[in-house]
UniProtKB/Swiss-Prot annotation:
Keywords: ADP-ribosylation, Host Golgi apparatus, Phosphoprotein, Ribonucleoprotein, RNA-binding, Transcription, Transcription regulation, Viral nucleoprotein, Virion. Residues 29-38, 45-55, 399-409 have a biased composition (Polar residues). This is Nucleoprotein. It comes from Bovine coronavirus (strain LSU-94LSS-051) (BCoV-LSU). The gene is N. ADP-ribosylated. The ADP-ribosylation is retained in the virion during infection. Phosphorylated on serine and threonine residues. Belongs to the betacoronavirus nucleocapsid protein family. It comes from the Viruses. It is found in: Virion; Host endoplasmic reticulum-Golgi intermediate compartment; Host Golgi apparatus. Residues 422-439 have a biased composition (Basic and acidic residues).
């Protein structure tokens, strides 16, 4: 009994497609299938991008049951842990979950500046005993092939899986069992996300793959009649970046000039449309913190919406509908304090609102939200208190503690030698005075 991915098990027996008679191929590969090597293998295209014309990648002459995984970061290895890496396919038991990922080196194209750019490769999964390496044993060291199998599968026998007929079977969006660790620097085609999200259910890739497959099967050549290729989106993006003089692989550096331009661009917006960030702080956008603007403190005032804690607070922000229909609104005309006296004065209005955001402890991330709110609500009061406290006098280098304290306390004129109680040697005059003090006192009765 053969199994068909995406369908229930059927009694259809395998028609011997693995021998090469029934496998669908690209039109330009029809002659290669007739050539047989001495070891009985079908002639396979080389897996290097330089094996054909500079603008073409290696050919994938077999249809995979699943959408591909595309590399978007250079230098990242394509690998899975042992027992992982086989996509989920309804109708295929775990004993048949074995096969390999095949690297498809895509074509290169010429950029606007005349240079050739090689697109990063894309990987496709084939069950053991099918695809471009149907004759190879599991675990054979082959460049551009990564073998995967579940723990329940017997890798010594081919998988009993039918080959995909693109005219009747669409490609299945690639998904993996929970707990699968996916290679970094790759994304699953059709999911719009990087490979770490293995639960995508998008069918965009399957429709695109099926449409392209039918076009190739009906037209008899590799060039679709519409002129649209799978790599056209990448080519267009690269051409646009080259035209603008930008490189998508290099991070954009923010200089003082660009930071000033960003800040001015934000400040030119209406007050209710501003989003503070590193280049334009909260105080620059909305002024100092106080009783009427009492949220924000510490790093959040410096980083604004760039603060790592801000996204979880943004989940509490009301929608436009909740703002208008769930708040108390009041329209008031205010004095226009902007502009010169020579300029015509404009009527300025304020739409004042009063509302509330209600949530409970069942909200996801409740503890973190409460922590962030407690740290930032009325934080200006704590900062003002710290500013009002007299700072502790700092001791200068090389100065003793006692000396510093005496200098800070003594602000009057210097003391005399007697007040300072400093010891010194007695002079002859001092000794004479002391003797007179010891003599008995006699009253002078002489008349003046």
């Amino acid at each position: 009994m053969s199994f068909t991915p995406g369908k229930q098990s059927s009694s259809r027996a395998s028609s011997g497609n693995r021998s090469g008679n029934g496998i669908l191929k690209w039109a330009d590969q029809s002659d290669q299938s007739r050539n047989v090597q001495t070891r009985g293998r079908r002639a396979q295209p080389k897996q290097t991008a330089t094996s054909q014309q500079p603008s073409a990648g290696n050919v994938v002459p077999y249809y995979s049951w699943f959408s591909g995984i595309t590399q978007f970061q250079k230098g990242k290895e394509f690998e899975f842990a042992e027992g992982q890496g086989v996509p989920i396919a309804p109708g295929v038991p775990a004993t048949e979950a074995k096969g390999y990922w095949y690297r498809h080196n895509r074509r290169s194209f010429k950029t606007a500046d005349g240079n050739q750019r090689q697109l990063l490769p894309r990987w496709y999964f084939y069950y053991l005993g099918t695809g471009p390496h149907a004759k190879d044993q599991y675990g054979t060291d082959i460049d551009g092939v990564f073998w995967v199998a579940s723990n329940q599968a017997d890798v010594n026998t081919p998988a009993d899986i039918l080959d995909r007929d693109p005219s009747s079977d669409e490609a299945i969006p690639t998904r993996f069992p929970p707990g699968t660790v996916l290679p970094q620097g790759y994304y699953i085609e059709g999911s719009g996300r990087s490979a770490p999200n293995s639960r995508s259910t998008s069918r965009t890739s399957s429709r695109a793959s099926s449409a392209g497959s039918r076009s190739r099967a009906n037209s008899g050549n590799r060039t679709p009649t519409s002129g649209v290729t799978p790599d056209m989106a990448d080519q267009i993006a690269s051409l646009v970046l080259a035209k603008l003089g930008k490189d998508a692989t290099k991070p954009q550096q923010v200089t003082k000039q660009t930071a000033k331009e960003i800040r001015q661009k934000i400040l030119n917006k209406p007050r209710q449309k501003r989003s503070p960030n590193k280049q334009c702080t909260v105080q620059q956008c909305f002024g100092k913190r106080g009783p009427n603007q009492n949220f924000g403190g510490g790093e959040m005032l410096k980083l604004g919406t760039s603060d790592p804690q801000f996204p979880i607070l943004a989940e509490l922000a009301p929608t436009a509908g909740a703002f208008f229909f769930g708040s108390r609104l009041e329209l008031a005309k205010v004095q226009n304090l902007s502009g010169n006296l020579d300029e015509p004065q404009k009527d300025v209005y304020e739409l004042r609102y009063n509302g509330a955001i209600r949530f409970d402890s069942t909200l996801s991330g409740f503890e973190t939200i409460m922590k962030v709110l407690n740290e930032n609500l009325n934080a200006y009061q704590q900062q003002d208190g710290m500013m009002n406290m007299s700072p502790k006098p700092q001791r200068q280098r090389g100065q003793k503690n006692g000396q510093g304290e005496n200098d800070n306390i003594s602000v009057a004129a210097p003391k005399s030698r007697v007040q300072q109680n400093k010891s010194r040697e007695l002079t002859a005059e001092d000794i004479s005075l002391l003797k007179k003090m010891d003599e008995p006192f006699t009253e002078d009765t002489s008349e003046i």
